[in-house]
């Protein structure tokens, strides 16, 4: 079988598999424990977050490890509505969004949110005028699927963000960047988004892990309570082996992207 559906998943790099297996064998300690080997693993986690932050163009403290991009989007949208929903109750997305977004919005609608789903143009793009028309002072969040997982349509994120900031300055912007990671050259510090979702298995990384990018100023309610791991944003024993694999995949994918980009230029 010739497998080409890399929008569904990718085969992990051999080096990623080796990294995960080595971490499972040698660094099995709980990073939250107090003894020396566990502290060493916690230090390695900081290094991995720093590497991912460098690749994505943000601060390490702005990244939260999740089990997948679906969880990241749930954390973003449910967390925002839980904190601000009594004052800002409208969330805007499109009919063509990923089920991770649409199902979450369906849940929030049942709990009092006002959901507006824009219909994309025939070319798959969001009409900025359509977006501006539905924005108002009660808009909590606009969720944008930057690269569509089925059609490959790339939204004009810069233009849409400008429309949102001008018409609804209090509104948060969430972006599903799952299909953009490793395929588009970007830096989060240059993008005007407040939250973003990422998945490791779309960049030849391991399944079962992803990231939520959250700007420092953004404070959604916490969904998972417990031991206070990840600065309290996502409690539960941290998954160092998969974080190590994700960081390795990100670094390798960045190098691969640079080579592919140069080859296309030639």
Model-derived features with residue positions:
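Pyridoxal 5′-phosphate
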Residues: 1-266
């Amino acid at each position: 079988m010739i497998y080409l559906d890399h929008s569904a998943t990718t085969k992990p790099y051999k080096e990623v598999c080796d990294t995960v297996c080595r971490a499972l064998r040698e660094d099995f300690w709980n990073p939250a424990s107090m003894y020396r080997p566990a502290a060493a693993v916690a230090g390695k986690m900081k290094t991995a977050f720093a590497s991912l932050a460098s690749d994505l163009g943000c601060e390490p403290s702005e990244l939260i490890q999740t089990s997948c991009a679906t969880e990241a989007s749930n954390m973003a949208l449910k967390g925002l509505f839980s904190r601000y929903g009594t004052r800002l109750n409208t969330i805007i997305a499109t009919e063509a969004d990923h089920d991770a977004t649409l199902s979450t919005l369906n849940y929030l609608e049942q709990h009092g949110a006002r959901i507006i789903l824009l219909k994309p143009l025939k070319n798959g793009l969001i009409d900025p005028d359509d977006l501006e028309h539905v924005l108002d002072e009660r808009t909590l969040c606009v969720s944008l699927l930057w690269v569509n997982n089925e059609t490959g349509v790339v939204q004009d994120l810069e233009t849409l963000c400008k429309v949102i900031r001008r018409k609804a300055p209090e509104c948060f912007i969430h972006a599903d960047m799952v299909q953009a990671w490793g395929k588009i050259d970007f830096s989060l510090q240059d993008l005007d988004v407040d939250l973003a979702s990422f998945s490791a298995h779309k960049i030849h990384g391991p399944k079962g892990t992803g990231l939520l990018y959250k700007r420092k100023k953004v404070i959604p309610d916490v969904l998972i309570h417990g031991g206070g791991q990840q600065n309290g944003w996502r409690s539960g024993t941290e998954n160092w082996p998969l974080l190590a694999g994700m960081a390795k995949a990100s670094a390798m994918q960045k190098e691969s992207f640079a080579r592919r980009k140069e080859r296309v230029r030639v």
